[in-house]
Amino acid sequence: MEMTFRWYGHDDQVTLENIRQIPGMKGIVTAIYDVPVGEVWSRERIHQLKQDVEASGLKLSVIESVPVHEDIKLGKPTRDHLIDNYIQTIKNLGAEGVNIVCYNFMPVFDWTRTDLAYVLPDGSNALIFDEEVAKKMDPVKGELSLPGWDSSYTKDEMKAIMDEYSKVDEEKLWEHLEYFIKRVIPAAEEAGVKMAIHPDDPPYSIFGLPRIITCKENLIRFVELYDSPNNGVTVCVGSYASDPNNDAVEMLKEMLKRNRVNFMHARNIRLTGKGKSFEESAHPTEYGSIDMYEVVKALHDANWEGPIRPDHGRMIWGETGRPGYGLFDRALGATYLHGLAEAVAKNAK
């Protein structure tokens, strides 16, 4: 597997030089963050991004992400033009030698947590999701803002888009996803780009919005929408495991068997036992609810050689910055995963 690390561009306090010094680090996962959603990423901008990354001695491994415009998810008449733009971006990425794109189909909100700096017993700060707190939150009132969210909405715009989604149930969202997939994947095949849909995080409905990339059955349904290795998935074990009904390792094995794992996010979470509430933990198995050794072993047993990255980290050793995306704990996670991979490989001999 190819160890990679999320980088938020030159405004990120975690620099490429920092990342390059992490043992075993090979690639960067990033995006172009200042192009409005729905517009085309030019080859010139992609080329510059690739040059910037490669100048640090790393590879531009994955784009995470090319966001999908809400009009596409809503199935509005404007979607065809927006999908045309999306396809052109995919073609431009392929032409510049960037061949994996992670994206999601979550309505309105990206990953969602209820506390960004919860203090764990060891004194570190972590992201958590409290199901009861989430039930009482009203996103229209702007009660919470997270790094993955589109912060450009006014309150009136947020109310309007939430009203539009009140008419979109899960089956209707499936229809819109299928429409998108059947247009984008043939172009991705021609461009040599593997698409990798990220799970909904957490993988169940929040704020009354439909969510569909949530469980094993829905993953199988998704990959069967279009039978191609280019129509693949990002297996984020931490996202899937945050629903107690999911077996994240079994879901990973199912997608590996189907040759659809195009990207991996490997992080741990600890289910608190209070409904679907969870805490994001340190990466090692003993701190969470996921057997991380079995995750890496499944990848090894399938001879999987794709990109993997440590995901959200705690804030430790006094570090501050973007919640979940500091340097120190993610670097620990990367070296832990690297060590697991070595142990699994040697035990297999």
Identify the residue ranges that each predicted region occupies.
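Histidine-acidic metal/acid-base catalytic patches
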Residues: 1-4, 9-18, 51-54, 71-75, ...
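Glycine-rich, positively charged N-terminal anion/phosphate-binding segment
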Residues: 12, 22, 40-61
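N-terminal ordered "arm"
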Residues: 13-15, 22-37
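Glycine-rich, proline-tolerant flexible connector loops at the mouths of alpha/beta enzymes
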Residues: 31-47, 109, 207
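Long, hydrophobic/aromatic-enriched structural stretches that serve as scaffold segments
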Residues: 57-68, 89-92
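Aromatic-lined carbohydrate-binding surfaces of glycoside hydrolases
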Residues: 65-72, 104-113
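Extended, charge-rich helix/loop segments that form flexible
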Residues: 108-176, 191
